[in-house]
A protein has these predicted regions:
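Conserved N-terminal beta1-alpha1 strand-loop-helix module at the mouth
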Residues: 1-131, 136-204
Length: 204
């Protein structure tokens, strides 16, 4: 990837207006709302109210898993999402039916290699791929297997202010995505951690 390009930064698992506005003002490029089953799940109605209060130029992303495509499109339209992040077994055909840009979640296992990751990505025509060892797992994966992948990849899973510089220097990804690594508790962000995380990313 282009090492001169500014790394995109998403704070995921937003559940309240205060956190959404604060992380936006601290410099996040995007914020994520989880509509799949999760301890950070949010209702479309609540997400819509939060998005209406956001400052301009913040990308809003909805996280879904194996939902009916018409349901995803309906929520995306109602909430005014900019993109959808699909973390299930959604097929390329399914992704092509989305009325928003798609970030396809790629589950990274301990048995994966660079070749197997590329195999999982083939046949998809999406805006980006997010490599994650499991939604909200708080664990990292072996970053070495993603070295040299010439696709727009976003790294997630176990990221924190302490390790995000390492993964950026190793992979030069399109973006990084953090949730539990900047939380006080499920669904509530620790702004000191958020600020430090963003500072670390921007210093790369």
């Amino acid at each position: 990837m282009d090492t001169e390009r500014r790394i995109k930064l998403k704070i995921c698992g937003i559940t309240n207006e205060k956190d959404a506005i604060m992380v936006s003002n601290l410099g996040a490029d995007a914020i994520g709302f989880v509509f799949a089953e999760s301890k950070r799940k949010i209702t479309p109605e609540r997400a819509k109210k939060i998005i209406e209060k956001l400052p301009p130029f913040i990308t809003t992303v909805g996280i879904f898993m194996n939902a009916k495509f018409d349901e995803v499109n309906k929520i995306a339209e109602y909430v005014s999402l900019d993109a959808v992040q699909l973390h299930g077994n959604e097929s390329p055909k399914y992704c092509n039916k989305m009325n928003r840009k798609v970030v396809k979640g790629i589950l990274v296992t301990k048995n994966d290699s660079k070749e197997s990751l590329l195999k999982k990505m083939e046949n998809y025509s999406v805006a980006a791929y997010i490599l994650d060892p499991g939604t909200g797992s708080g664990e990292t994966f072996d970053w070495d297997i993603a070295v040299g992948i010439e696709k727009p990849i976003i790294i997630a899973g176990g990221l924190s202010p302490e390790n995000v510089r390492l993964v950026i220097k190793k992979l030069h990804p399109y973006g990084v995505d953090v949730s539990s690594g900047v939380e006080k508790e499920y669904g509530k962000k620790d702004m000191k951690k958020v600020k430090k995380f963003i500072t670390e990313v921007r210093s790369c």
